[in-house]
From Swiss-Prot:
It comes from the Eukaryota. It holds the Pfam family F-box. Residues 1-22 are annotated as: Disordered. SMART domains: FIST_C. LRR repeats lie at residues 265-288, 418-441. Coiled coil: none annotated. Disulfide bonds: none annotated. This is F-box/LRR-repeat protein At5g63520. Residues 31-78 form the F-box domain. Keywords: Leucine-rich repeat, Repeat.
């Protein structure tokens, strides 16, 4: 905090009259400081970086009230750096996002490589130990560069035909937010040794409900959850249980496959895992503060999704299903029947079906099974199970005259599926739809101001997919060119959507689509004054 010094005339003091005269002169000199015009003070404080602003808010009640008015509106700022030095890159993005008044409520750091613990420590030193922080390793980042505010992308690129990836330089994206009226913290999912998947899933849901009860009141739902998950077979069931448990108004976005560290708001540093514990995911939870309802209701979270896949118009039912437990991730061997037919097809026959329709197109692209999983869900033992249908993607890894081989597990005999392929035209049309959604947001009667944006983009998209840079950033750039947005390239994009499918009895069936591939999931944070 800058010190304010007053110029005093050099004078010789003699007697009480001289002292009294000097006191009156000093008090007269101090009046302009104490009674500084509020608008002038507002303009001065508005230009301070975050640290100086924090000191200024402690000067006196008047300054504090002006600071509070400056921060009466929410802020969400992202910036990235390509600096190959991890420490300097971290300092660059921290300097950028803290270059204006803000009281950090949460920080998200995404790095392409390097040491997550170092980044977590650096951020904690700059923003304080009471701020929840998530650090994750991702396959790429996008947003605006800290040094020039220009939009750009940093991605992993294939270095050989065996699809090994390499990043020559470190890059970091930092996102910091202040949302008055909201409480923000991190709810982690750690699977303890011997803990069943069902116990872990239920505990996560109950931890969320308990936090909401404490912050927002009984039966309240989170406004938003941002999820970062590890590459573990335990992740998918947790996410489906969460999708089932959270009401439709809760916005949920994230990345399913990656690495992360986290620090909760009440923890001074990252908590080390116990031996044999497994880090599954961390959820950044946004809850409306029941003590500040007016402010909380002015903040809205919205999502938009750009899908990049199209289905082949052939429907199958899984016949024989066998799971193979690999060293890191399980895989599934299956045969299938065409819907309405009795003949069991092996893996080669299934792909020959697709090959005949698409004229060898399948072998030029990634192919996926889009499996409709109709399952019963409940929370704990007291709740009656309910059925939810979800569309889940499994990448095709090969076939022979016996089986079709796909990634992952959880497919059951009788599950219906179609083959899905990346489709550039679908992706481009979907991006235009997302951009139109954002335009419509601007034209709402209450005229919300978009204050933040974040994108979770499939790692196979980007310039190599679209043939041009910044395509996945275009909805933000076209509609909000000044917005300091950010985003990551990841695997397993998380975003809630509902689709209607025609069932076997010609009835429409609602199907949840929560986990995506070849898509972009956009989070938009807006504020209504």
């Amino acid at each position: 905090m800058a010190e304010v010094s007053l110029t005093k005339k050099e004078m010789t003091t003699k007697g009480k009259s001289e002292n009294s005269k000097k006191m009156k002169t000093d008090m007269a000199d101090m009046v302009p400081i104490a009674a500084m015009n509020e608008d002038l003070l507002h303009n001065i404080l508005l230009r301070l970086p975050a640290k100086s602003f924090a000191f200024a808010s402690c000067v006196n009640r008047f300054w504090s009230s002006v600071c509070n008015r400056i921060l009466s509106r929410p802020k969400m700022i992202s910036a990235f750096s390509r600096n190959p030095d991890q420490l300097r890159a971290g300092e660059e993005v921290l300097d950028k996002v803290l270059s204006e008044p803000i009281r950090p409520q949460f920080v998200i750091a995404n790095i392409t490589c390097g040491n997550m613990e170092e980044t977590l420590t650096l951020i904690t030193e700059r923003v304080g130990s009471r701020v929840p922080i998530i650090v994750s390793v991702v396959t790429g980042i996008l947003g605006k560069e800290a040094c020039n505010d220009k939009a750009g992308e940093v991605r992993l690129h294939s270095t050989s035909d065996d699809e090994l990836f390499d990043v020559a330089n470190f890059a970091i994206l930092l996102t910091i937010g202040y949302l008055p009226g909201m409480k923000v913290d991190i709810i982690p999912v750690i699977q303890a040794k011997g803990e069943s998947g069902a116990e872990m899933e239920d505990k996560f849901v109950m931890d969320i409900r308990n936090y909401m009860s404490m912050v927002s009141g009984h039966a309240a739902a989170p406004a938003c959850l941002i999820l970062f998950a590890e590459d573990t077979h335990a992740t998918e069931p947790v996410l489906h249980k969460l999708d089932y448990a959270m009401p439709a108004e809760t916005v949920i976005v994230g990345g399913q496959i990656g690495e992360f560290l986290h620090k909760r708001g009440n923890e001074p540093r990252n908590v080390q895992l116990q031996k044999d514990d497994i880090r599954v995911l961390a959820g950044l939870i946004f809850a409306r503060d029941r003590h500040r309802p007016a402010q909380a209701e002015r903040i809205q979270f919205d999502t938009a999704i750009s899908n990049g896949m199209s289905s082949v118009d052939l429907r199958y039912k899984a016949a024989n299903v066998n799971v193979s437990l690999g060293p890191s991730c399980p895989s599934t061997l299956l045969t299938a029947k065409r819907r309405g037919e009795a003949e069991v097809l092996d893996g080669d026959q299934i792909l020959d079906d697709i090959d005949n329709i698409l004229e060898n197109y399948i072998w030029e692209n990634d192919s996926y099974l889009g499996v409709i999983k109709r399952r019963k869900y409940s929370i704990g033992l007291e709740e009656k199970p309910k059925i939810m249908s979800s569309l889940v993607f499994h990448q095709v890894n090969g076939s022979d005259d016996q089986d079709l081989l796909v990634d992952g597990a959880g497919i059951k005999t009788g599950d219906q599926f179609q083959v899905y392929l990346p489709d550039l035209k679908v992706a481009e049309a979907a991006l235009n739809d997302v951009s139109a959604q954002l335009r419509n947001l601007k034209s709402k009667p209450n005229k919300p101001e978009v204050v933040g944006g974040f994108a979770f983009v499939g790692s196979c998209r980007g310039d190599s997919f679209f043939g041009c840079p910044n395509a996945d950033s275009s909805p933000f750039l076209e509609n909000f060119p000044e917005l300091p947005f950010g985003g990551i390239f990841c695997d397993g994009e998380i975003g809630r959507s509902l689709i209607l499918e025609e069932g076997e009895e010609k009835k429409e069936v609602s199907i949840q689509r929560f986990l995506h591939v070849y898509s972009s999931v956009y989070l938009i944070v807006s504020y209504t004054s």
